[in-house]
Amino acid sequence: MRAPMTSKGAQRLREELEHLKSVKRPEVINAIAEARAHGDLKENAEYHAAREQQSFIEGRIKQLESELSHAEIIDITKLSAGTKIVFGATVTLADTETDEEKRYQIVGDLEADIKMGLIAISSPLARALIGKLEGDSVTIDAPAGQREYEVVSVAYLD
């Protein structure tokens, strides 16, 4: 099954992949060559550290290539869901107790980053929001107990 991903999320992954291939991979290859020049490889900590870093970089490159090849990239600016919450929606919620507003965008699992306000489509919050409309209330089971929010606005921004 293909994993949904926003075009912006796919672009971020492509940029990371390009950086790893064009900058990090050559750096670590040079570091390995430099460490080899120091002689005995058995007790050469620089060599072993560089090889470990190379392994990490190559693993991340393979992971990113796989994620991108299995992604279903969705251009959310072309969605016409109106005020209904679907994948890609940017939702502003107001806590009904504190009136504190929070803004989240519902994205694919691979691009989720709560610090940036990006929540995974599979998260409990996103699952509770899908299908709701502006003005609807939603109850979320949070670690600190149940919280009730009102959907203040729904937008489809890139």
Curated annotation (Swiss-Prot):
Keywords: Coiled coil, DNA-binding, Transcription, Transcription regulation. InterPro entries: GreA/GreB_C_sf (IPR036953), TF_GreA/GreB_CS (IPR018151), Tscrpt_elong_fac_GreA (IPR006359), Tscrpt_elong_fac_GreA/B (IPR028624), Tscrpt_elong_fac_GreA/B_C (IPR001437), Tscrpt_elong_fac_GreA/B_fam (IPR023459), Tscrpt_elong_fac_GreA/B_N (IPR022691), Tscrpt_elong_fac_GreA/B_N_sf (IPR036805). Transmembrane segments: none annotated. The keyword Electron transport does not apply. GO terms for molecular function: DNA binding; RNA polymerase binding. Residues 45-73 form a coiled coil. Gene3D superfamilies: Transcription elongation factor, GreA/GreB, C-terminal domain, Transcription elongation factor, GreA/GreB, N-terminal domain. Pfam families: GreA_GreB (PF01272), GreA_GreB_N (PF03449). One of its GO terms (biological process) is DNA-templated transcription elongation. Disulfide bonds: none annotated. Belongs to the GreA/GreB family. Necessary for efficient RNA polymerase transcription elongation past template-encoded arresting sites. The arresting sites in DNA have the property of trapping a certain fraction of elongating RNA polymerases that pass through, resulting in locked ternary complexes. Cleavage of the nascent transcript by cleavage factors such as GreA or GreB allows the resumption of elongation from the new 3'terminus. GreA releases sequences of 2 to 3 nucleotides. This is Transcription elongation factor GreA. It comes from Xanthomonas axonopodis pv. citri (strain 306). The lineage of its organism: Bacteria, Pseudomonadati, Pseudomonadota, Gammaproteobacteria, Lysobacterales.
